[in-house]
């Protein structure tokens, strides 16, 4: 009965789509933290305040706006620059940050991060380039973008020297698995070995980001912003250190205790499997 009747009801996937977008933003931001940590940068990541993902440094900030396209077709100049029914465009929302910044300001980078390449007006699909400066686009595409931004942002001069298009691969269906693998690779490259509890470590990092991103109130000061919305390098290191401190010796002690407490082979096997699932 329900097989037929339920699917007559109107459905709404906007909530699920919003949650998936939120999840992709968080995981991409975590990947950015791995990148900055390996580069020995002193950073604080801020999630969902001025922009989707923000990398804060001592005096400058990089802003990243994430977009996904399930159809896998390239984004066009019109797609990113032409305003929608509300009068806002994808790149316009990003460029408005620079318009609001003082001169000289704090913006060092504005980047549109997309899981499909950009197709410019010269018919070129930029699939071989991970990061493109908008200033390096063909003249026709550049002029088209500037034309739209001049009107949308109500400015006479458009400066795109700090604006970029980043083409990045994103697993839209199982992003956690992809990022878990990337986290393990990060750990091996930095510390020379895999973390003892990779799944737990990953869940802790992702949960910390989720808490920061989910805070919805206006921050009263920059210090308040960092406290409520920021994930600092120090906090990141503290979480990583806890994973490193789980020694092989402590795991062996647990296994010996299992052997003493559970003499029956089947129970002993179940307990060892449980331990393995926790520390993997």
What are these model-derived regions, one by one?
Residues 1-16, 69-280:
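Acidic metal-coordinating catalytic centers involved in nucleic-acid phosphodiester chemistry
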Residues 14, 18-19, 23-83, 89-90:
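Catalytic centers of nucleases
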């Amino acid at each position: 009965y329900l097989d037929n009747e339920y699917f007559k009801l109107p459905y709404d996937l906007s909530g699920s789509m919003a949650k998936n977008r939120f999840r992709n933003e968080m995981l991409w931001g975590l990947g950015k933290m791995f990148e900055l940590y390996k580069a020995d940068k002193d950073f604080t990541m801020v999630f969902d305040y001025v922009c989707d993902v923000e990398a804060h440094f001592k005096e400058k900030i990089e802003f990243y706006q994430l977009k996904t396209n399930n159809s896998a077709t390239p984004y066009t100049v019109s797609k990113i620059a032409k305003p929608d029914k509300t009068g806002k465009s994808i790149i316009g929302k990003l460029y408005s940050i620079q318009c609001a910044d003082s001169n000289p300001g704090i913006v060092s980078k504005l980047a549109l991060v997309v899981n499909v390449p950009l197709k410019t007006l010269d018919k070129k699909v930029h699939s071989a380039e991970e990061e493109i400066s908008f200033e390096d686009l063909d003249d026709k595409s550049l002029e088209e973008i500037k034309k739209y931004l001049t009107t949308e942002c109500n400015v006479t001069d458009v400066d795109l020297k700090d604006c970029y298009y980043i083409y990045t691969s994103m697993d839209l269906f199982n992003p956690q698995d992809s990022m878990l693998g990337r986290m393990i690779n990060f750990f091996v490259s930095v510390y020379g070995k895999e973390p003892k509890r990779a799944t737990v470590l990953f869940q802790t990092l992702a949960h910390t980001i989720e808490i920061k991103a989910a805070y919805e109130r206006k921050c009263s000061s920059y210090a308040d912003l960092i406290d409520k919305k920021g994930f600092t390098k120090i906090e990141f290191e503290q979480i990583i250190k806890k994973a490193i401190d789980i020694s092989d010796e402590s795991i062996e002690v647990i296994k010996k205790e299992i052997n003493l407490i559970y003499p029956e082979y089947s129970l002993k096997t179940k307990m060892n499997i449980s331990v393995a699932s926790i520390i993997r």
